[in-house]
């Protein structure tokens, strides 16, 4: 992403996802200012979740697409989808903010979950969203990895305290790298 590079091939195909090679070769690219780019995600999974208690809570207090309103997560619907079930989590983090576990300015911690296994793995937690990161800047990427993991640990603690079935849970793993959604456009 930065530093000295040499490309010696006669022809290249830019498959970087960020138009890195196209930009270096002088192609016309555009990139919004960091504050205008889509937020990045830090994905993670938890283990030690009581599946039965977690699913019972989900059924007792189901989240819908209407619950996505506000914060970083918003979804535009025609209205008919508003009452449909969605694997969305916001309430544990709102409670954590109210109790001072999560700072008020981090009201962006919320999002979706994937599956909960019989072994107690709660997977594909897409709860941490970081604004103003330029995915073509190594310093921004490093800052995002550090801050994203810090926020993920807050999210794990909030889930343990405020989401039934997660009382004995712990971090299982992080995704390989921060999820960047938008950089350069050709």
Residue ranges and their predicted role:
Residues 2-11, 15-186:
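Flavin (FAD/FMN)-binding glycine-rich loop and adjacent Rossmann-like elements that form
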